[in-house]
A protein has these predicted regions:
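Extracellular/oxidizing-compartment recognition motifs
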Residues: 1-268
């Protein structure tokens, strides 16, 4: 953290008072600042087959409270939770870029999410732009075939948690097949995640990591849809405009019952 203040001299060279102190923070500027390891959550790799999202977790201890910063990125898109609370409102982190040249990492202030004593971090990671159907003509695996995360938690500049082989992972969670273009499958029966197994450390390097230099994608507005019934008996929800977002709705159903929601920019 860098602290600064200013003072001015007028046209008569008379010096004014110092301003109030302000400060800014410096992220991880050099490869050697990273002590975390890239970790791969998957046991099996079938590049041409769609895989479910992965869940990674780790319990850790915090001795003293302080200014806590979580540095994190992924091969894929991720969400991070500490003690059940989301670390950020960033949607589709780490964002899109030419990953082989620049992969952005994010810095989150998680001071208010930590407890003195026992804590748990959970990270979900899915295909995203890394290996989803986002290439020209729907080509998969544009940047690689293996998902991975890299994260490092510091409190008052002291490292208290890193991603390494001590983490556990599972593919038996509610978010199954997931793709930015093809959609996702969510199975609420699997919300109690099970079948945890060890992760694998990978030597993916740090040379392409850069601090996040773009605006976060966050929720901005909510739209209430208008329900329409077609002559064929289909239910259509019209939001009245083209948007980038997702749908929230409630319903009554039995375990195992399937509800399919199709998205489209126009109606046939």
């Amino acid at each position: 953290q860098v602290t600064w203040k200013v003072r001015l001299w007028d046209e008569k060279d008379i010096c004014g008072e110092w301003s109030e102190k302000s400060n800014f923070e410096i992220g991880l500027l050099d490869e050697k600042d990273w002590v975390a390891e890239w970790i791969d959550p998957e046991l099996f790799h079938e590049p041409e087959e769609r895989q479910p999202a992965s869940y990674l977790k780790k319990e850790f201890l915090v001795e003293n409270s302080g200014n806590a910063r979580l540095y994190i990125t992924a091969h894929g898109i991720y969400n991070a939770y500490i003690n059940g609370k989301k670390a950020s409102d960033f949607i589709l982190a780490p964002g899109t870029s030419q990953y082989n040249a620049r992969l952005q990492y994010q810095t989150y202030d998680v001071s208010g999410l930590l407890n003195v004593g026992k804590n748990e971090i959970l990270v979900t990671v899915g295909d995203g732009w890394w290996r989803g159907d986002t290439g020209y003509g729907g080509v998969r695996n544009s940047f690689g075939t293996d998902l991975a995360i890299l994260c490092q938690l510091e409190i008052d500049r002291k490292t208290v948690l890193i991603s390494d082989k001590s983490w556990s992972a599972s593919q038996e969670g509610p978010l199954g097949l997931n793709d930015l273009m093809q959609g996702e499958c969510y199975d609420a029966r699997k919300e109690n995640i099970c079948e945890w197994h060890p992760v694998t450390e990978k030597q993916f390097g740090y040379e392409n990591l850069v601090c996040s230099n773009s605006f976060d994608v966050v929720e901005k507005e909510n739209f209430i849809g208008k329900q329409i019934h077609t002559p064929n008996g289909e239910v259509v929800i019209d939001f009245g405009q083209n948007i980038a977002g997702y749908v929230k709705f409630g319903f009554y159903a039995q375990a195992g019952q399937c509800i399919t929601l199709y998205h489209g920019e126009c109606l046939d």
